[in-house]
Design a protein with these regions (language model features):
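C-terminal/peripheral segments of proteins
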Residues: 1-220, 224-227, 240-462
Length: 462
């Protein structure tokens, strides 16, 4: 109970107490057990309740992390070497940091104190802290961090995708699939004469280069003899789809419902309801969607709740499609032409106090019907749910276009507004523009700022 196993024998836990103050209630006292690999998370994190202790090991707590110095250095950097010096001060988190200057230099560099594990170790799973192998780390010099400086292809980008190997080694990480990266490359490669208006359009691009391929994989599994009229019409819509997720598109409504049903019918029987919902909230599920549709030999296709029967890929995808169309008919009606994306994909900026019904109209901003989707450049993302409604739970915290040859006419937009005061006119004055993919001119000229500013005076109470 008070000891844990290590490669050199058993050691005592270091035990500390943490006190959480709760307003208008008793303090919550937590007893935390510390090991060589970090704190034991059993009982603290959902899904970790077994007898074997599971600890959390994080570079952030193990290395010198000069975050404030890094921010200061980056803010005051004069050139590329200054920039890279600032990035090198960040031990964690791992970030893709972009650079550009008025002299035409461009670069990107990952931050973080990166390391290599033994070749036999799979970091996608919980590691064994007792064998002396899984926890061996070779910390790497900053020069080994993935980066590109003035690359021959003349641009840099990041979409949280897997970077190329360094010295033959692919750094493991919690990456997103290649969807956005593929679309960005597809837009950048053919064109050299970019304007800030072109870049603004690209930032709001709603098209997936991958989704039509996935849709084709799904369609290939269908038994065409068993389709209703609505199902046949739905298939034709998906066959003609270019991957766009605009307000009046019908295909994304059908596609996402089918995707959700296929994931549910594939994984929920093995994982159970709680773990399946947890999986839906991770990056892992986004990595799974495309390759699983092609993997006919996957053991996941079998529904373990059915006895004396082994389901196949085709059976699960057919079942998922029929269910998707039936559910959409119930949710949106029998007219497929009315199944437009704006009816199910919405954005509402929710305030903690907005959960109170009487205060919702004061503090919450929206909802708005919005274009975009998961894993498109206009990444207004959502989690799948039985409801068939795709409520945005994340997206760009800001959109900016800065032309170094015309700084004073740069463009930006915020999701809601500049003020956090719900009674300010600037609390939500950008929200509709943001939802519509529009921009506002940034004020970077001192004279213009002074000319259009207002004065706020704070007077002490007497």
């Amino acid at each position: 109970k008070n000891q844990y196993k290590t490669p050199t024998g058993f050691q005592n836990y270091k035990i500390r107490k943490e006190t959480i103050k709760v307003k208008d209630s008793s303090d919550v006292i937590l007893e935390v057990k510390e090991t060589l690999h970090g704190p034991v998370m059993n009982g603290f994190l959902d899904g970790i309740n077994g007898a074997k202790p599971v600890t959390m090991s994080w570079v952030f707590t193990q290395q010198k992390n000069q975050m404030l110095e890094a921010v200061y250095s980056l803010s005051h950097s004069k050139d590329l070497p200054d920039f890279r010096k600032g990035v090198s001060l960040i031990a964690a988190p791992g970030l893709n940091i972009m650079y550009g200057d008025a002299k035409g230099n461009i670069a990107w560099n990952t931050s973080g104190k990166l390391y290599k594990l033994d070749e036999s170790v799979n970091p996608n799973f919980i590691l064994n802290g007792t064998n002396g192998i899984d926890d061996k780390k070779e910390f790497l010099d900053f020069s080994k961090n993935p980066h590109a400086i003035n690359p021959s292809w003349n641009y840099v980008y990041s979409a949280n995708n897997q970077p190329e190997a360094v010295d033959g080694y692919l750094y493991p990480g919690y990456y997103l699939p290649q969807d956005r990266a593929k679309r960005i490359l597809g837009l950048l490669e053919p064109k050299n004469n970019w304007t800030k208006e072109d870049v603004g359009k690209m930032i709001n691009d709603n098209t997936s280069s991958v989704a039509p391929i996935v849709a084709s994989n799904l369609i290939s599994a269908l038994d065409s003899k068993s389709l209703s009229l609505n199902e046949k019409q739905a298939i034709e819509i998906l066959k003609k789809w270019n991957g766009s997720n605009d307000l009046k598109d019908i295909a994304p409504t059908i596609y996402n419902k089918w995707i959700y049903n296929y994931l549910k019918n594939t994984f929920r029987d093995e994982l159970g309801e709680a773990n399946f919902k947890m999986l839906l909230s991770t990056h892992i599920i986004k990595q799974i969607i495309a390759p699983q549709t092609k993997n006919e030999n996957s053991v996941w296709w079998d529904d373990i709740s059915t006895k004396n029967k082994k389901e196949t890929r085709n059976e699960i995808l057919n079942k998922s499609f029929h269910g998707a169309i039936a559910e959409l008919e119930k949710q949106l009606g029998n007219d497929l032409n009315s199944w437009t994306w704006n009816r199910v994909h919405t954005l509402e900026h929710q305030h903690p106090l907005g959960k109170v019904a009487l205060l919702k109209g004061i503090f919450n901003v929206g909802p708005f019907e919005v274009s975009g989707s998961n894993e498109v450049i206009n990444n207004l993302m959502f989690n799948f749910a039985d409801s068939g409604e795709y409520v945005v739970n994340g997206g760009p915290s800001t959109r900016r276009v800065i032309d170094f040859s015309d700084i004073e006419n740069s463009m930006s937009i915020l999701p809601t507004g500049q003020s956090g005061n719900p009674f300010s006119k600037h609390y939500n004055d950008q929200a509709e523009m943001y939802a519509d993919g529009k921009f506002r001119k940034m004020k970077l000229n001192k004279e213009e700022i002074i000319k259009t500013s207002t004065e706020l005076i704070f007077r002490p109470m007497k």
